[in-house]
């Protein structure tokens, strides 16, 4: 791959906790961030980045960082698969048995 060159570089920092930042390169890397002062003294930021993958598709991620932590969103972030219906039914059955007083030993064998 050839050397990438910066084709966009915008930065603004007001010195009071408000800022924005954006850049792009010739090989498709891009990033942007906007920041504002948070209610608890932290910097609240929103932004994202993207780049081209070897297969030609584009990776994209957006994020927010604030008093609630860092939260990222991207179709590339793995997600839990939903539980199959039979597992949900079995979990409900176990809860019902517990309500009726059922107990199990440490190996999962029902003792009452």
UniProtKB/Swiss-Prot annotation:
Expression tissues: Arthrodial membrane.
Q: What domain of life does the UniProt record list for this protein's source?
A: Eukaryota
Q: Which residues form the signal peptide?
A: none
Q: Which PROSITE patterns match?
A: CHIT_BIND_RR_1, CHIT_BIND_RR_2
- Organism, scientific name: Cancer pagurus (Rock crab)
Q: Which cysteines are joined by disulfide bonds?
A: none
According to the record, which residues are glycosylated?
79
Q: Where in this chain does the record put each Chitin-binding type R&R domain?
A: 16-85
Q: Source taxonomy lineage?
A: Eukaryota, Metazoa, Ecdysozoa, Arthropoda, Crustacea
Protein name, UniProt field: Cuticle protein AM1239
């Amino acid at each position: 791959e050839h050397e990438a060159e910066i084709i966009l570089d915008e930065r603004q920092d007001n010195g009071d906790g408000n800022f924005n930042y954006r850049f792009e390169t010739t090989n498709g890397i891009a990033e942007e961030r906007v920041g504002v002062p948070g209610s608890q003294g932290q910097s609240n930021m929103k932004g994202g980045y993207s780049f081209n993958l070897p297969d030609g598709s584009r990776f994209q991620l957006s994020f927010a960082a604030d008093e609630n932590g860092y939260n990222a969103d991207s179709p590339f972030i793995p997600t839990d698969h939903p539980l199959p219906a039979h597992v949900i039914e079995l979990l409900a059955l176990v809860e019902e048995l517990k309500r009726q007083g059922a107990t199990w030993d440490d190996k999962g064998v029902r003792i009452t």
